[in-house]
């Protein structure tokens, strides 16, 4: 009984705050992340001295995405009696079973969007502090981080290393 009440409460919270369905939550998350990335690009190009403004927009967007992630995760856990008992993070098969639930897929996507945006914001700041060209940051680092986060991180690390090395 308490589990069904919690599940209904979480579902109502998600519907009220995030959308009528998990698909709508997914779409809203994408739109919000796009806004966050666009703001990050514009501020990186034109607001070199506005680090706080750039950081706050990216962090607020990531915070909202994180809250949506938390609601979906709690909703899944509250309704997990229907989930496979073999679903876990200890094996590839277990993770595959977890991702059969659309709430988990959407939560995973929101997790990806939030973290990559936070990493993109941080890489932008690090590159600016180390004198990496904004053209490289906006033209290469941010798109790579958006599409393939770890690749953007590696690219940025190489750019910063080369920039520091060339200064000596």
Model feature map: region roles:
Residues 50-71:
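Loop-to-helix transition at the N-terminal end of transmembrane alpha-helices
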Residues 107-114, 143:
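Hydrophobic alpha-helical transmembrane segments of multi-pass membrane proteins
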Residues 30-50:
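N-terminal signal-anchor/start-transfer transmembrane helix
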Residues 66-87:
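Transmembrane alpha-helix/helix-exit interface in multi-pass inner-membrane proteins
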Residues 138-161:
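Hydrophobic, aromatic-rich membrane-embedded alpha-helical segments
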Residues 1-12:
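N-terminal chloroplast transit peptides
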Residues 13-35:
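Hydrophobic transmembrane alpha-helical segments in integral membrane proteins
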Residues 94-107:
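Short aromatic-rich membrane-water interface segments that cap or initiate transmembrane helices
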């Amino acid at each position: 009984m308490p589990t069904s009440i919690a599940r209904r409460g979480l579902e109502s919270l998600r519907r009220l705050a995030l959308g009528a369905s998990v698909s709508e939550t997914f779409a809203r998350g994408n739109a919000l992340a796009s806004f966050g990335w666009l703001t990050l690009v514009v501020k990186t190009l034109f607001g070199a001295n506005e680090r706080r403004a750039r950081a706050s927009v990216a962090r607020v967007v990531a915070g909202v995405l994180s809250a949506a992630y938390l609601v979906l995760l709690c909703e899944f856990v509250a309704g997990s009696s229907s989930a496979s008992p073999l679903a876990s993070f200890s094996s590839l098969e277990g993770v595959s079973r977890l991702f059969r639930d659309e709430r988990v897929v959407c939560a995973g996507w929101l997790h990806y969007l939030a973290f990559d945006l936070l990493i993109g914001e941080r890489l932008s700041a690090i590159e600016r502090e180390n004198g990496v060209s904004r053209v490289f940051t906006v033209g290469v680092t941010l798109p790579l981080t958006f599409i393939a986060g770890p690749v953007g991180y590696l690219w940025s690390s190489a750019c910063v290393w080369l920039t520091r090395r060339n200064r000596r």
